[in-house]
A protein has these predicted regions:
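A short acidic, Gly/Pro-enriched loop at the edge of an enzyme's catalytic core
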Residues: 100-108
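C-terminal alpha-helical "lid/dimerization" subdomain adjacent to the S-adenosyl-L-methionine
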Residues: 142-186, 191-193
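Core SAM-dependent methyltransferase catalytic element
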Residues: 189-208
């Protein structure tokens, strides 16, 4: 990913914006609801401060989690959040590189992270996620996607209370339909957008 994520200032600004995302909790709740009641291992890609993985593990008390991130400020936040949790393993990894060998998982989740990698890498990553999922596993990606038009994007910025000058320079937004098509082509089943608010969408696929 881009070097912005090495900056504590950039990471702090991102987390502050993320905390103010309208309806974010609705998307997170829908994501957690799509995870089977019994899961043993959950992989969180681009974990940030660990908010999503924390929600998942609270809802699925028998699960253990692996949190992947490469930003030093985010890794620091992860270590603070999960300092006393034996259920979480933290791994330093850049999503622009192939996933490390971490075994297989019953669920792979991500929240506002994959849109920071180039489009070609997005598809490669989706293929790698398919490979590490157990049969019956689910991939849930709460993601920032491209708007259908410049006008829709402007309205999204307005709803967020920001201007074009405030946009994250590391964003590499891709439309939702392309990503759903990729998931289907890779072999995921029941692929759909399970929740959406403007440019924020929950993309879900299952491995049968």
């Amino acid at each position: 990913m881009t070097r912005e994520w090495q900056s504590a200032e950039h990471a702090a600004a991102y987390l502050e914006r993320a905390d103010r995302v309208p309806h974010r909790s609705a998307g997170e709740t829908t994501l957690v609801d799509e995870i089977p009641a019994i899961v043993h291992r959950v992989l969180d890609l681009g974990s940030g401060d660990g908010r999503l993985l924390d929600l998942v593990l609270r809802a699925r008390p028998d699960a253990r989690g692996v949190a992947l991130d490469f930003s030093p400020p985010m890794l620091e936040q992860l270590n603070i959040r999960f300092a006393s949790s034996p259920r979480v393993e933290i791994a330093n990894h850049d999503l622009e590189r192939p996933l490390p060998d971490l075994g297989t998982f019953d669920a792979v989740v991500s929240s506002f992270a994959i849109h920071h990698v180039p489009h070609e890498r997005k598809r490669q990553l989706y293929e790698e996620i398919w490979t590490v999922l157990e049969s019956g596993g689910v991939f849930c990606n709460l993601e920032h996607v491209a708007s259908v038009s410049p006008g829709a994007h402007e309205r999204f910025l307005g709803a967020m209370g920001i201007t074009a000058a405030d946009e994250d320079p590391s964003n590499k937004l891709l439309d939702m339909e392309t990503q759903l098509r990729w998931l289907r082509e890779i072999g995921f089943a029941d692929v759909d957008c399970y929740w959406k608010w403007r440019e924020l969408a929950l993309l879900v696929g299952r491995k049968r």
